[in-house]
Amino acid sequence: MKAILQRVTDAKVEVDSKTVGEIGTGFLILLGVENGDTEKEADALAAKIAGLRIFTDENDKMNLALADVNGSVLVISNFTLCADCSHGRRPNFMAAARPDTADPLYEYFCKKIHDNGIERVEKGIFGADMKVSLVNDGPVTIEINTKDLKI
């Protein structure tokens, strides 16, 4: 499971010109579910993200977690994070989990973010063509791959 985390001051996602998710201060998370991912990876990733201290404190040090700043999360499913660009010019997406596996894990991940103390979790619509806009704060952008976590 892969996540791209962006610290934002505002973010929203639209489907068919209608806003389906919107947050203020928090994280915009692009989530890619790979073949072989399970709830174990979702649990570990949600816990890692909820506890990640990348908001600045009064001394301008990255020392505060999402809950410390009363932040929210906007989670967007994004199979393109699973792209393999090692051959040719067209990405290969064979590492991405099939929708019948990825969608339930996406929903489970969103629930686990909430279970880890994040009150407001907004979502895009799995599999939809979405328009995502954000105001990046910093910018702070972090990539997390559960294959790199000790779980």
What do the predicted segments below correspond to?
Residues 45, 76, 140:
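Residue-level signal for inorganic ion chemistry
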Residues 18-70, 81-95, 99-111, 116, ...:
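Compact, glycine-rich, soluble single-domain proteins
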Residues 71, 134-138:
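A short, glycine/Asx- and small/polar-enriched loop/turn
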